[in-house]
Amino acid sequence: MEKQIYSYDEAYEESLRYFQGDELAARVWVNKYAVKDSFGNIYEKSPEDMHWRIANEVARVESKYPNALTAKELYDLLDHFKYIVPQGSPMTGIGNDYQVASLSNCFVIGVDGAADSYGAIIKIDEEQVQLMKRRGGAVSYTHLTLPTI
């Protein structure tokens, strides 16, 4: 089944309706959170579509456990950001088949032991690059790095 592709203007207008005329919210949602493929094709027309994507994916995982919430129950919690407000990376990443995204926003990284060698510093840099390319933020725990005097 081929997914519907929306133009920027279609997604913006529908998001503007959803956000009751808030132009900034509508533009930010389309630019940052609407599902897009690597060619920039937009696959969600409004935050309602996003909430259904998130609800369906969480319900899929929840179904493996007792007392699971249905997709509709989860959608009702997400709708208009009333009870559950996912942060940026989860809003983009949950149920998104078009890109690899982190489901967490921020990570603390570091190495075991002293981090005062070139190798340890490069390892931390590599971890930061991998996290940032997946839209995660990184905090380096570098208190073990010795200053040069």
List where the protein language model places each region:
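A short, hydrophobic C-terminal helix/tail in secreted or cell-surface proteins
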Residues: 145-149
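Extended catalytic cores of very large enzyme megasubunits
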Residues: 1-144
